[in-house]
Amino acid sequence: MNKKVIVCDIDIVRKKGISYFQDNYFWPVSEHEYKDFVNFSTETYNSLLLDCKDNKVFDIMLQEYQFVDTIQKILHYNYVKNYSHEHEFTMLYGDQTKSLFFPDWEKFSSVFFKTTTRYTEFILFIKRILKNIIFNKFKFFLKKVLKPASELNFALCIGSMSDLKKTYIYDNEIYCDHKYWNHIINSKIKVDNELDLNKYSFVSSYLDALKSRNDLFVKGVDFRGIEKTWLKRLSEISSVYDHLLTIEKPKTLLVTDQANPAHKIITIAFQRSGVDVVCFSHGNNLAVLNQTIIHQFVISHLKKYVVPNETIKKNYEYIYSVLPIEKKTGTRYLSLNIPNINQYNNCQKKQRTFEKTKIMLIGFPANTNRLTDTAGDFSLFKIDLEYRIILKLKSLGYFVQYKAHPDRLDEISGIFNQLVDEYISERFENVINNTDLIVFTHAATTTFGYTLASNQPIVMINVKGNPWNELTYDALTKRVHMVPAILNNGIRIEFDQNYFAEKIKVAINSKYKYVANLGV
């Protein structure tokens, strides 16, 4: 192994080849170091947030979890850069990580107004009209619009039409006006650049806390540039927030895609104005993992969050209702009382016969994100692991399928295409029945929840340290065949390949019953 080289991203793995990556496998930031840093960063920000007494500043701080996440990601790569300089490593990186090693903080100064859209305002208007007709059902649409406005059960809707949202709308006979966020937030909003810096002192307090660590994460970081950029962001967010408080609003707002920055500020401002804002889960997150950090970033600003059924609701409440932030925001979990997701998703395994046993490996997103709540969930760690899993499955004579995420094809393309028997890029819902068994290396994906709700055999590479929800873990182990794994030196996932092979055999021949307290 050439210890003087650090392969920094998937671009280099693709360019140099998977064997080169294996021969030079190394990452300077261990799991323990990274978790320690992110926990410190998040807890510092949370403390400032909880101490905030100004409602507007509190709301904007909720919004700016997004920028905290950006800072954490960039400082992760700053550690790598500093380590390579101190220990005379050569960093090999491509376009994927170049902007993280050499960040242009100014590009983060706008949250809404520098965002490009695929469609013109006119096209968005036409799409809005069509969505209103299609999703409200044409007869239902005509029936409702002929009534006086006072008799309509009306709601404004933003975000995609998920199955949960659709069920909620139809069950409650809601006439939904579907809008794109661009119809609510537009470039005509005047940005007031005169911030009361005393009110927004959390910026300097948070950054000073990071600087005080004096470690490789923060060495050489342009904190003045970060602060300047952040204050510009806050000016824009503050102006948009004030605008949203003053515009005419419906009684009810229905929201999906809550992580979208525009959806988030609309949700927060409308909630503050007394609008009944109802938000919807993706539908396949059963809360079998405790993902507190990402949950706070994406969900904890909501007052109402709808999940499929009472069991899943209890799973969420058990983990997240104790969070101080959710106690302050008043987050409530609501159930649609769907008996089980299996019926809801209609993903029962069909009878079929393959000439050769097919095993589908679910690929990890090959991006630059490193998840903190879970163990070993970083693309370079997972590429290394997936390669060894593929080789083992091939050596056992199985037909190996690699399932790439449809939105991540450019990232993973060219890595495993020639190694596996079938490279799958279709939606998972369309291919779940085209295999004999599914292997996961991570559970922080809605694909895992969707598979739990089927009767497909599942084998999970379970890395030590995964924060399973203790309320559901016993039931989960009756449904999923767990293969224990560790993070060697905090950077390489290792598991017993013979035990893995045995688990594959057992899982394929098992019969599955749905486990009630998983909510499937």
Sequence positions of predicted segments:
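Catalytic-core helical/loop segments in enzymes performing group transfer/polymerization on anionic/lipid-linked
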Residues: M1-V520
